[in-house]
A protein has these predicted regions:
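Sec-dependent N-terminal signal peptides of Gram-positive bacterial secreted proteins and lipoproteins
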Residues: 2-24
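Hydrophobic alpha-helical segments within soluble ligand-binding/sensing domains
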Residues: 56, 153-195, 295-316
Length: 372
């Protein structure tokens, strides 16, 4: 499963080899790299030959480990690489990026991190909470800088002392979800809700805080809460079917990577039962959920790259570099599911407008590349 790509972004930057919003998965390499056949990717981003600093450019090795192959996380990786390429060109430095995806396998994750350390990576990048926690443990003695991306609650899982002052060698970007805002949309769409399902993976630390917030909100309204969980695509599919049998009127899922990976499998189960699935990221809506509410992952990826550059080029101390959070007021609605549920998108957009910074539409697809 190993995939080794060698991508030199030099003068090719002007040709826009990568797009800022596209989603890049392990199997979707640029045209000149399609012959590569492994799971890991080595990407070198360098200044153009004409750059004044190119003759003495400094090179940095960065190891990026992605937790799982899904639309949100792939979009983050894509935009980290794209932004690093731009910074490398601008500053006249070379970023040699080693990328791999552990596919939610903790043993493989540990091996990937060990490989990065064996290659003397100058900085490690953890995409999603489980990878960040593994990198924290792996760098406890070395102090190698770690920048995490899309960690929903870095304080509660012990990655940082506080968002303002992380306190160690880790900092990064958070995709913290305003759960109450999602609940508000749910009840604006259907004020008569009496039974709501919560679908998530008990083992996902990223989901824990949001699930507790959702339960408190719903119970405060006197709504019956049905919880169903799973740790794999098959288990999530069974849990979705169980929620339909339970007679829930709506389902909520936070930024849960296991459910995200399962969405293409389960979305028809909910749509055919007339149940809207409210979720914590636009990628869920891309893969068939009724609504995704949360951060712009393309922007999160770019900002993660800015933090990487600040540490490597400007000497910023991760311990004193605040975790970056984002406005997550964008509601992404799947218009195909909207129609299937008998909901008028234009009317719903007007209804949601006072509760969101932005309402946008999307159609069902596997990746963002397919809808751009």
């Amino acid at each position: 499963m190993k995939k080794l790509l060698s991508i030199v972004l030099a003068a090719l930057m002007a040709a826009s080899l990568f797009t800022a919003c596209g989603a890049k998965s392990e199997t979707a390499a640029p045209a000149e790299s399609q012959a590569a056949a492994s799971d890991s990717t080595s990407t070198e981003t360098a200044a153009p030959a004409s750059s004044e600093a190119s003759s003495d450019a400094t090179s940095y090795t960065i190891g990026i480990c992605n937790y799982v192959d899904d639309a949100s996380l792939n979009q983050i990786v894509e935009n980290i690489q794209t932004r690093l390429a731009a910074i490398g060109e601008e500053k006249g430095v070379t970023f040699s990026v080693e990328y791999d995806n552990c596919n939610a396998d903790s043993n493989l994750m540990s091996q990937i991190i060990s490989n990065f350390q064996a290659d003397s990576a100058d900085l490690l990048v953890a995409v999603a909470t489980p990878v960040a926690m593994a990198m924290q443990a792996a760098t406890e003695e070395t102090g190698t800088p770690v920048v995490f991306a899309a960690v929903s609650d870095p304080v509660s899982v012990g990655l940082v002392d506080s968002l303002e002052a992380p306190g160690s060698n880790l900092t990064g970007t958070s995709d913290y979800l305003d759960t109450a805002a999602v609940m508000n949309l749910m009840f604006v769409q259907n004020p008569e809700l009496q039974k709501v399902g919560l679908l998530y993976d008990l083992g996902q630390d990223s989901a824990a805080s949001a699930i507790e917030s959702a339960k408190a909100y719903l119970e405060g309204k006197g709504v019956e809460v049905i919880e169903r969980t799973g740790t794999s695509v098959d288990e999530i599919a069974l849990a979705a079917q169980a929620l339909v049998s339970d007679g829930v009127e709506a389902v909520f899922t936070p930024t849960d990577n296991t459910v995200m990976k399962s969405e293409l499998t389960i979305y028809e189960t909910f749509a055919e039962a007339g149940i809207p699935h409210y979720t914590g990221a636009d990628s869920f809506a891309l893969n068939g959920a009724f609504l995704g509410y949360g951060v712009d992952y393309a922007n999160l990826g770019a900002e993660t790259a800015n933090m990487i550059a600040s540490i490597l080029l400007d000497g910023a101390d991760p311990a004193a570099t605040a975790v970056k959070t984002f406005d997550n007021g964008t509601a992404t609605i799947n218009t195909e599911i909207c129609e299937q549920l008998g909901i008028d998108f234009d009317e719903l957009s007007e209804t949601f407008a006072p509760y969101c910074t932005k309402v946008q539409s999307i159609v069902t697809a596997e990746s963002f590349d397919e809808v751009q």
